[in-house]
Structure formats: C-alpha cells, structure tokens
Swiss-Prot record:
Coiled coil: none annotated. This is Hemoglobin subunit epsilon. One of its GO terms (cellular component) is blood microparticle. Residues 3-147 form the Globin domain. The keyword Transport applies. Heme b binds at H64, H93. The keyword Phosphoprotein applies. It comes from Eulemur fulvus fulvus. Belongs to the globin family. The gene is HBE1. Transmembrane segments: none annotated. The modification Phosphoserine is found at S14, S51.
Length: 147
C-alpha cells in the first residue's frame, strides 16, 4: 500500500483541479500508442493508427484517453485505497482484456510527461515526485488481480 503525506496529497489535489481531463487524457493515450506501438494491439477497433498524426487526431483515441484519465480521478479521490478503487478495473484488464501490467507503468510515466508539458515551471521536482508516486501506486493497483 502506498502512503501519501498530507503535503503530497495536497500537491496532487491542487494540480488535478487544473487538469483538462479531455485534452490531457487524449494526449496521454495517444503518446502511449505512438511511443510504445505494441500497445496498439489492444485498440484494433480504433481505426487508423498508422502514424503519429493519425493516432493523435483519432477521435476514438481521444475519447478513450478521456475515459482513462477520468478513471484516474478515482485515484486522486482514493489515495488511501488505490487497490480498492481499481479492483474492478484490475479484474477487467487481467481477466477479459489480458493487458500486460507493464503497460500501466508506461501509461503512468507518459501521463507524468503530459502533466509536465501542460504545467511547465509549476511542475516542480516535488510535484513530479508526488505524481510519480501516485502513478506507480495506480499501476500496482491495476496489476493487483494478475496471477
């Protein structure tokens, strides 16, 4: 279980309140699919994923990215119980979708890059440390149901 200090929680909540979930979610998933092309196999029904511009402009990528980042908001609300907050998603990704749990770490790291891009100087090393801790905790929680 990940333990967050009061300062880390405050830091995460403060930045999360400024995140444009639709924009950042689409960018994060899009970047994941471009940088780690093997992850595209989970999105066969998304249509054209043939190039970076096709991926980043794909409405299904944007919509699913928003959905992913919206569910990440559950992590922000449930920092003290990440495993509980992500139990059903962990089961879905393990039993039905068969997603390699390593992909959760990759997406978390991409998300941190997107946040750094969006928030620039406001995304200090302390802010990054808090967010890295959160995305790592989410990746662990999502991998929890794997055998």
């Amino acid at each position: 279980m990940v333990h967050f200090t009061a300062e880390e929680k405050s830091t995460i909540l403060s930045l999360w309140g400024k995140v444009n979930v639709e924009e950042a979610g689409g960018e994060a998933l899009g970047r994941l699919l471009v940088v780690y092309p093997w992850t595209q196999r989970f999105f066969d029904n998304f249509g054209n994923l043939s190039s970076a511009s096709a991926i980043l402009g794909n409405p299904k990528v944007k919509a699913h990215g928003k959905k992913v980042l919206t569910s990440f908001g559950e992590a922000v609300k449930n920092m003290d119980n990440l495993k509980g907050a992500f139990a059903k998603l962990s089961e879905l990704h393990c039993d039905k979708l068969h997603v390699d749990p390593e992909n959760f770490k990759l997406l978390g790291n991409v998300m941190v890059i997107i946040l750094a891009t969006h928030f620039g100087k406001e995304f200090t090393p302390d802010v990054q440390a808090a967010w890295q801790k959160l995305v790592s905790g989410v990746a662990t929680a999502l991998a929890h149901k794997y055998h």
